[in-house]
Amino acid sequence: MKCALVTGGSRGIGKAICKKLAEDSDYHILINYNSNKEAALDTLKQVNEFGNTGEIIQFDVADADAVKNALDSWMSNNEGSIIEVLINNAGITKDGLFMWMPAEDWHNVINTSLNGFYNVTNHLIQKMLSNRYGRIINMVSVSGVKGTPGQTNYSAAKGAIVAATKALAQEVAKRKITVNAVAPGFINSDMTADLDEKELKRMIPVNRFGEAEEVADLVSFLASKKSSYITGEVININGGIYS
């Protein structure tokens, strides 16, 4: 059984990615969630509606032991299965000016977005190398490419993943493993629900926020064999802002 794992797959962009992979591929979809089991089950239901299979898998990406235990348990119960596609989507924001930022807000964002990338990817990379195939797609952000005031912690985490994407891509390319990053701009989701879209869209050349499904379309392509000559890239999907 060939599988695709989407961390933070229960809501928002992660949910849209799970659904699009179910529509476009034959992968068994592993929907990771941390605490919202109800949302994860709803995503699974919609995956099944595409005629595809999937399951939910609970762990906090920031907790290295939890990641190891959950993935080792899954692998022991699914011998012969391989996770070919990894979408590192889980992340949190704790916005505020750096001068007033509590250490907790800094470390929580770094632990989830950056250390979470390490915890999951490092645990799966050996299997991909042995299998001589893989797709790793890291969800970053315009904040990680440009830097966003009020999001120094988030910008630092995502910026580090941008650099890690480029480095790791070069390390594993000969084994037919591609590593790319997708950098969304303003996308309609829980993370942007409190933003003033009317004001902000004036900055965006296409004059609107993006949709999670548009991001999922790009991710699905990068997860496919059609993208085999693309690696180490950061692809912006932002309506032209900051271009």
Regions found by a protein language model. Name each.
Residues 121, 157, 165:
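Active-site helix of classical SDR
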Residues 133, 211-237, 241-242:
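C-terminal substrate-recognition "lid" of short-chain dehydrogenase/reductases
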Residues 26-42:
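Conserved glycine-rich Rossmann-like NAD(P)H-binding loop of the short-chain dehydrogenase/reductase
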Residues 126, 170-174, 228:
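Alpha-helical segment proximal to the catalytic Tyr-Lys
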Residues 97-98, 105-110, 200:
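Substrate-binding pocket helix/loop in short-chain dehydrogenase/reductase
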Residues 141:
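Residue(s) in the substrate-gating loop at a strand-loop-helix junction
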Residues 10-12:
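Conserved glycine-rich cofactor-binding loop
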